[in-house]
């Protein structure tokens, strides 16, 4: 300590036969020394200590993906991994996986958007792997006037707001998260998250058109999916839900576990 005092030119401690106390210069010195040490610890953590494996999923707004993610996280040591799940816009799902921000992306193809999405997959060197194919369902809250119907037609829906997820600058129907997005609806309301969407269903008797694969454990039991009834002017369409990953890559153990959990849940819903 005396050598350090000589080197920096200040007295850090007052020394007496009763012990030592900090001088004013000493307190100032320790203040800066503590900051330097904390910076050193940050650098050590970033560059010297073993790094955690980061596992990320980007997805359109599907509650079953969150369910599979939860079950996956429960199976691994949280001290060895950092996790991220991003419910986001369609184009961001693609970009996140292409830029390796996420390991897997979950979205759907249909007859309407297949050509556009396949082109984007090719441009970004991504592969699409189908998981499940399903027809359109009307998703609404249990207090909705149409909730007790065995099926619902487009004519019946016209009296209520159609809810969809905001896609930002990519507002084309090719990037919509809802099936039958190419149709014209008298009333349209856009939202950015599932919680707001559910609130609008209750507050405005809104509806959305989806796969019908709903996780009640996460969304609650106040909502239900009713089959969409097509007619000659308003045909039904198939949703092909799947995942994307970079070409010529393999998922590690945690990625495979996530896929297994997702497939298991989708299998139960069938």
Residue ranges and their predicted role:
Residues 3-22:
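A short LG(V/I)-centered, amphipathic sequence patch enriched
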Residues 120-162:
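Flexible hinge/capping segments at coil-to-helix
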Residues 139-147, 240-251:
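A bilobed periplasmic-binding-protein/Venus flytrap-type ligand-binding module shared by bacterial periplasmic
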Residues 52-95, 253:
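N-terminal winged-helix
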Residues 65-69, 110, 114, 150, ...:
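Secondary-structure junction motif
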């Amino acid at each position: 300590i005396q050598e350090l005092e000589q080197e920096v030119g200040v007295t850090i401690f007052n020394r007496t036969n009763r012990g030592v106390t900090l001088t004013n210069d000493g307190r100032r010195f320790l203040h800066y020394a503590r900051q330097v040490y904390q910076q050193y610890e940050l650098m050590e953590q970033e560059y010297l200590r073993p790094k955690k494996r980061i596992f990320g999923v980007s997805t359109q707004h599907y509650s079953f993906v969150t369910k599979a993610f939860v079950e996956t996280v429960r199976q691994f040591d949280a001290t060895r991994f950092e996790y991220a799940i991003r419910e986001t816009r369609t184009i961001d799902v693609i970009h996140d996986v292409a830029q390796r921000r996420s390991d897997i992306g979950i979205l759907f193809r249909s007859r309407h958007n297949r050509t556009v999405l396949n082109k984007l997959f090719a441009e970004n060197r991504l592969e699409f792997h189908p998981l499940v194919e399903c027809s359109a369902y009307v998703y609404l809250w249990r207090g909705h006037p149409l909730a007790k119907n065995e099926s619902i037609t487009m004519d019946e829906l016209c009296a209520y707001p159609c809810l969809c997820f905001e896609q930002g600058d990519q507002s084309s129907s090719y990037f919509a998260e809802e099936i039958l997005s190419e149709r014209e609806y008298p009333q349209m309301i856009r939202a950015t998250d599932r919680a707001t969407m559910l609130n609008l269903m209750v507050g405005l008797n809104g509806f959305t058109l989806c796969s019908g694969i709903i996780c009640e454990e996460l969304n609650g039991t106040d909502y239900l999916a009713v089959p969409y009834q097509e007619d000659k002017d308003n045909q039904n369409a198939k949703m092909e839900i799947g995942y994307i990953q970079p070409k010529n890559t393999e998922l590690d153990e945690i990625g495979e576990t996530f896929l297994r959990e997702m497939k298991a849940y989708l299998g139960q819903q069938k």
